[in-house]
Amino acid sequence: MFTITQPDTQPSDHIQHKIDNKTKPLGALGQLEAVALQLALIQQTEKIEIRHPHLLVFAGDHGIAQHSLSIAPSEVTAQMVANFLAGGAAINCFCRTNDMALKVIDAGIKVEPEDHPNLIKQRLGHGTEDFSQYAAMTDNTVLQALEYGANVVEVLNQQSCNLVGFGEMGIGNTSSAAAIMAALLNIPADECVGRGTGIDDQQLQRKVDLITQALDLHAEQLSDPLSILASVGGFEIAQIVGGMLKAAENKMTVLVDGFISTAAAMLAVSMHPEANHYFIYCHCSDESGHQRMLQHLNATPLLSLGLRLGEGTGAALALPLLRSACCFYNEMASFEDAGVTV
């Protein structure tokens, strides 16, 4: 479904030499230097740039949410989608201040929203099934979700966008992400489950128990990423996977947000390991398990701000760092240019 090749590493010595010969001590710009190197390898150009950056927020409801594993009911998903479209959410603020276009994708929320210029409807249903009792979705729905996510990114690629961030909204999706993590890493649910929106100890234990029950129920269907998505995934998570893989296929830079988006990235990398070369992990969230996910992906996040909101907020906040990496790479003088001797 996707043809992904890792960036040509032949220019890496030239790129690193260019970075090392800027007017600074070796490595003095820390992680920004690694970002510049990654962007230069992805783009394979003498100057690197960010063109028409977009943040895509995929929204979907989850059958597992009927067990009250969140402080918020499922109705909040649709309410927050309306808030995104009205421009009133945190992600709207961060996209506005960082000059990043925002699109909202209805992957399958309970209540279909009204049409809006910034809304893309790719509905797969009125929410997934309760994966503690049934498969979250069918195998065919997973394939449709991947295609839907890929289509959104392909449109952006045709519009000369070369960087896309992925966010999400869906009451219950931390449960889905934790189940995905447990299945991929083959570890117990209690090592993956966090408090999500801020649940108490009793709800936390209920969440662990339900996810453990689900993993036992679907044990024979958790052998590959697509089956994991069908068993315990979410409509929005599956579409994000498709979008990430299409972005990598198109050699676009991918900004990975928090716990849920990183679960999607884990699935994408499990399907196509080469995709990870195009992924920049924006932050380490406060959600339990996220740090372990990042370690599994051999990822060093750019930020650690204690975020646990989702929506793509960490991705939007990281964008200025990427712009700064481009600026120093393109414009900072070399020792020779500046007449500085060391």
Swiss-Prot record:
Which terms are listed as keywords in the entry? Cobalamin biosynthesis, Glycosyltransferase, Transferase
* Annotated catalysed reactions: 5,6-dimethylbenzimidazole + nicotinate beta-D-ribonucleotide = alpha-ribazole 5'-phosphate + nicotinate + H(+)
Any GO molecular function: nicotinate-nucleotide-dimethylbenzimidazole phosphoribosyltransferase activity
Q: What is its EC number?
A: 2.4.2.21
Q: Which residues form the active site?
A: E311 (proton acceptor)
SUPFAM superfamilies linked: Nicotinate mononucleotide:5,6-dimethylbenzimidazole phosphoribosyltransferase (CobT) (SSF52733)
Free-text function comment from the UniProt entry: Catalyzes the synthesis of alpha-ribazole-5'-phosphate from nicotinate mononucleotide (NAMN) and 5,6-dimethylbenzimidazole (DMB).
PANTHER family in the cross-refs: NICOTINATE-NUCLEOTIDE--DIMETHYLBENZIMIDAZOLE PHOSPHORIBOSYLTRANSFERASE
Q: What is this protein called?
A: Nicotinate-nucleotide--dimethylbenzimidazole phosphoribosyltransferase
Instruction: Give the pathway annotation.
Output: Nucleoside biosynthesis; alpha-ribazole biosynthesis; alpha-ribazole from 5,6-dimethylbenzimidazole: step 1/2
Q: Which organism is it from?
A: Photobacterium profundum (strain SS9)
| Gene Ontology terms: biological process | cobalamin biosynthetic process
Phylogenetic placement of the source organism:
Bacteria, Pseudomonadati, Pseudomonadota, Gammaproteobacteria, Vibrionales
Q: Which protein family is it in? A: Belongs to the CobT family.
Superkingdom classification of source: Bacteria
* HAMAP family linked: CobT
